[in-house]
Amino acid sequence: MNSLFASTARGLEELLKTELEKLGAVGCQVVQGGVHFQGDTRLIYQSLMWSRLASRIILPMGECKVYSDLDLYLGVQAINWTEIFNPGATFAVHFSGLNDTIRNSQYGAMKVKDAIVDAFTRKNLPRPNVDRESPDLRINVWLNKETASIALDLSGDGLHLRGYRDRTGLAPIKETLAAAIVMRSGWQPGTPLLDPMCGSGTLLIEAAMWATDRAPGLHRGHWGFSGWAQHDETIWQEVKAEAQTRARKGLAEYSSHFYGSDSDARVIERARSNARRAGIGELITFEVKDVAQLSNPLPKGPYGTVISNPPYGERLDSEPALIALHSLLGRTMKNQFGGWNLSLFSASPDLLGSLQLRADKQFKAKNGPLDCVQKNYHIAETTADSKPATVAEDYANRLRKNLKKLEKWARQEGIECYRLYDADLPEYNVAVDRYGDWAVIQEYAPPKTVDAQKARQRLFDIIAATLSVLGIPPNKLVLKTRERQKGKNQYQKMSEKGEFLDVSEYNARLWVNLTDYLDTGLFLDHRIARRMLGEMSKGKDFLNLFSYTGSASVHAGLGGARSTTTVDMSRTYLEWAERNLRLNGLSGRAHRLIQADCLGWLREANEQFDLIFIDPPTFSNSKRMEESFDVQRDHVALMKDLKRLLRKGGTIMFSNNKRGFRMDLEGLAELGLTAQEITQKTLSPDFARNRQIHNCWLIRAA
């Protein structure tokens, strides 16, 4: 009997143990990452040929303590390699693990290689050659602290390499993991199996091979035992012949069918080729089809199973599309696949929540470094009076109500951009803005006391409901997460897409960018203030400080201003402001753009203006500014500088976003200025619930 070890992906150990025991293994002991077992030579070949779950079959050769590189060398030499190698066999060493002595795996591999080669030369035998690409023998050494474990990898290449898959494409899951997913899905061979996002077909091919009793090792051309001195070719050929006989019989007797679809025509062609190479191409129908086109191939029965490894995404901006995909799949399952089972494998349990289905079972497994979950569902048969459940029903109802009221108002006002929802319900703590036929969801980061997974699931529900209520495609919904007004967060670069959208605001056209920054280039709550500036600006010289993207300058220019001067510290936003001005036919010397620290420029400027708009940050401590600024502390000093630039009879419109801001009326009076608060006049219906979004004042000489 040989002591052996079968490695596998974490989470599959118990499943592998059961498989090995069915093959005849004894003394099976589960450890993290695999199973120790015992078996004779025939069992070695059977496990290599028939294990659908093992990554490798390893034959341990010995262990040694490693306190120096000499210890490693001598420990390897203690093994009788001349009785392990066939004459002329090539080999390669795979070394993993480090300690205080062996600090480089390549160095460790070199010491092992030297020890093996020297074992031959000392007996005056031809030295074996190294072949790193396709060796006859693969020696594995694992160094854990001071102990090195030395073993012969009888698999050669990993057992997930079945020999049927085109290796040029991306592989989301290995064949061994795919087989485990099929086994855990609850699917019964002989019943229909469908994968609506099949990619290169791995799940379906593994299922078909299992159902037709086709050994996973049948198509492999290279093994790790070809240079092993104890290899028994007779027994191996018997195991191989038995596998071939069983495969022919299984294929001839199998009567059910498999169905695969994917939106990518190239991967479907690859899936067809893979299935043909696996010898089960006739059993699987592959189609180019989007999930939106998914339908039951057997509406009159029998019932089957839908299985898939849907995309999960790693970028925030991909989530709306993925949530919509899962939500659509859930609805399609309920509408067309009553009586069927569904099994999905995913690295995102939150996305699976968007199905709006209750799982009967779930399993955990690792897909490479990713923690994944497989959830199995039974789809109840639908009845005529069944009503589909609404995702985030309270939120959806409020959004629908707001849309009905605000859409009509916005159309009458001649605006395309407005706030549709602003944390109206505390449990749905987001803002939703419309930009033409686009929508932006801004999630306010939940407090640390809120369970992160629950908050994420709630956000996914919000996205699904928003897509449903607004009736927009997922690629026109943008998701952002922000904390409430923290310093320079609004200027944080998020992406590099550079996609701009032309929107209308009253008589102005403005560029917005919904993806690249936390803010979009247009502060919606200042909409009425901008219109007022346009109405006040005819024949006047207009100054816009802390101008952002210059939208106020556009309104002033369109209102007939004699000149506009737009000042901001950011070159990016000044270039954006210039684009906005040009979009409205405003260019030339009458429309100046100045890149400068606004506070510094204000102290040094000696020009005169009739109308000044200033919307400073609540607080700023930018490295590019000479000093810190606090709007509550410094607004009187700011007004003193502004007064110097204000012509007789001129007006300053002063706005800021500080909650609880208190205007120092006495301080202004000492400067000879009066202030009239116009905050309520500048709040539009879409911001009626948030009356502290900003405060706004008209300031004039007394």
Curated annotation (Swiss-Prot):
| Homology family | Belongs to the methyltransferase superfamily. RlmKL family.
Q: What are the annotated GO cellular component locations? A: cytoplasm
Q: State the Gene Ontology terms under molecular function.
A: 23S rRNA (guanine(2445)-N(2))-methyltransferase activity; RNA binding; rRNA (guanine-N7-)-methyltransferase activity
Task: Name all THUMP domain ranges.
Answer: 43-154
Q: Which InterPro entries match?
A: 23SrRNA_methyltr_KL (IPR017244), DNA_methylase_N6_adenine_CS (IPR002052), RlmKL-like_Mtase (IPR000241), RlmKL-like_Mtase_CS (IPR053943), RlmL_1st (IPR054170), SAM-dep_methyl-trfase (IPR019614), SAM-dependent_MTases_sf (IPR029063), THUMP_dom (IPR004114)
Primary localization class, coarse: cytoplasm
Is the keyword Thylakoid assigned to this protein? no
Q: Which UniProt keywords are listed?
A: Cytoplasm, Methyltransferase, RNA-binding, rRNA processing, S-adenosyl-L-methionine, Transferase
Q: What does this protein do?
A: Specifically methylates the guanine in position 2445 (m2G2445) and the guanine in position 2069 (m7G2069) of 23S rRNA.
Q: Which NCBIfam families match?
A: PRK11783.1
Organism (species): Salmonella gallinarum (strain 287/91 / NCTC 13346)
Catalytic activity field: guanosine(2445) in 23S rRNA + S-adenosyl-L-methionine = N(2)-methylguanosine(2445) in 23S rRNA + S-adenosyl-L-homocysteine + H(+); guanosine(2069) in 23S rRNA + S-adenosyl-L-methionine = N(2)-methylguanosine(2069) in 23S rRNA + S-adenosyl-L-homocysteine + H(+)
* Keyword check for Methyltransferase: yes
Location(s) in or outside the cell: Cytoplasm
Which Enzyme Commission number(s) are listed?
Answer: 2.1.1.173, 2.1.1.264
Question: Which CDD domains does the UniProt entry name for this protein?
Answer: AdoMet_MTases (cd02440), THUMP_AdoMetMT (cd11715)
Instruction: Give the organism's phylogenetic lineage.
Output: Bacteria, Pseudomonadati, Pseudomonadota, Gammaproteobacteria, Enterobacterales
Q: What is this protein called?
A: Ribosomal RNA large subunit methyltransferase K/L
